[in-house]
A protein has these predicted regions:
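N-terminal intrinsically disordered, cationic/polar leader segments
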Residues: 4-12, 17, 23, 37-43, ...
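Amphipathic alpha-helical interaction segments
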Residues: 27-35
Length: 59
């Protein structure tokens, strides 16, 4: 995915989350993550992405 595609997909996600509303955002993101995990199909790659995502947020 190039930079423009990444920006387009991020923008699409932002609009979709706005459309469903703040109260449903976490559920939509959780569902999206589960769907992407299935499509990636590589447990170590998904685990590494989880580690990257939480970096800087852990106490």
């Amino acid at each position: 995915m190039n930079a423009q595609e990444l920006d387009d997909v991020y923008t699409r996600l932002a609009y979709a989350l706005t459309e469903v509303g703040e109260e449903k955002t976490s559920m939509v993101l959780a569902r999206l993550v589960l769907l992407l995990m299935q499509r990636v199909g590589d447990a170590s790659a998904v685990s590494a992405a989880i580690d990257d995502a939480v970096e800087g947020f852990r106490p």
